[in-house]
Amino acid sequence: MSVSNRNGNGSEVIYVGDRSTNRPPRNAPSPDEDRKEVKILFFDLTYYNTTTKFLLCCAGVFVLYLLYGYMQELIFTLDGFKPYGWFLTLVQFAYYTVFGYVERSLESKRVPRCIPMKTYVLLAFLTLGTMGLSNSSLGYLNYPTQVIFKCCKLVPVLIGSILIQGKKHGPLDFLAAIAMCLGLTLFTLADSQVSPNFNPFGVLLISLALLCDAAIGNVQEKAMREHKAPNNEVVIYSYGIGFVYLSVIMLLTGNLFSGITFCMKYPVETFGYAFLFSLSGYLGIQIVLTLVRTCGAPLAATVTTARKAVTIALSFVFFSKPFTINYLWSGLIVVLGIYLNVYSKRSKLTFADLNRTAERIYRKLVPQRGGSSSTKKLLLEV
């Protein structure tokens, strides 16, 4: 259908179909106004497309967290430092709180706190559990074993997204989780056979850290989505409250002053390395929080998991430790799980699709009772 009008200049304007569908409505928001602001520190990624944002965040995660992993393992090579994993966590929390406060102070636009304090009380507790237990586990485990456990973070994240956010996942997600669990089990068995530092208590510590980590990702995603909180706010309150928690605990247990005494003997190897360790970790957290905000917790976990696989390889290069070929095979199974998880984001495969496919295969393999109609006709003709 076409309708023609003449304007004041005498020229004819033709609208094809309904006029309302061809002319933009008045006061319609421009595409730029609909965009949600995405910033990492002072870098504005709002006007980049989704793929570019994802690739930039991935590059940042790999560079910063590879440095983070290297500095973390380097600190624990200092003789006598292994019992002070919780003190390292305290120093790390202090640095993170200062970094977050400085970043927030330099912002031109001050924004009041968005997320309720009771949510931050929970986040601080989970953050303390994640980082404290993870740092402490290095006193009992080989570094690659600790990292391979972290690679399987997707498993508790998957469970947490179902329980906390009520999300539904397809069969590929669960298959990825199974592959990761299998690879993790084989890697742990291999490490227990060749590593002189293997201790089952370390497995317990890192497992508890993963449970806290899974809850953090989902609670953060839900809170940031509902309250539109900036990254630095989440960091300041999560780590600031966590610092208070840990300070009180270490003061009551008497470990605070012993940690200070030891670190003052080696200030460069402890406080100095911890500064680089914390700075790279802080910047990495900003990028991971942006990934959580834009892509969701499971995909963010997949990116950080892939980075950890590279960290394991570099750990064997920079730090001497026993190696067995079983590390490689079990690690490849974990990588397969990572790939399946990434592929599941593109695939629309559901359990209903699998059920229909299984039914079709069953019909082809198992003949129907009484035979088909064509078979009956052939028998009658004979």
Curated annotation (Swiss-Prot):
Region: Disordered, residue numbers: 1-33
Protein name: Adenosine 3'-phospho 5'-phosphosulfate transporter 2
Primary location group: Golgi
Biased composition (Polar residues): 1-10
GO CC annotation terms, alphabetical: endoplasmic reticulum membrane; Golgi apparatus; Golgi membrane
Disulfide bonds: none
An MF annotation (GO) of this entry: 3'-phosphoadenosine 5'-phosphosulfate transmembrane transporter activity
Alphabetical keyword list: Developmental protein, Golgi apparatus, Membrane, Transmembrane, Transmembrane helix, Transport
GO BP term, pick one: 3'-phosphoadenosine 5'-phosphosulfate transport
Name of the gene encoding the protein in the UniProt record: Papst2
Family: Belongs to the nucleotide-sugar transporter family. SLC35B subfamily.
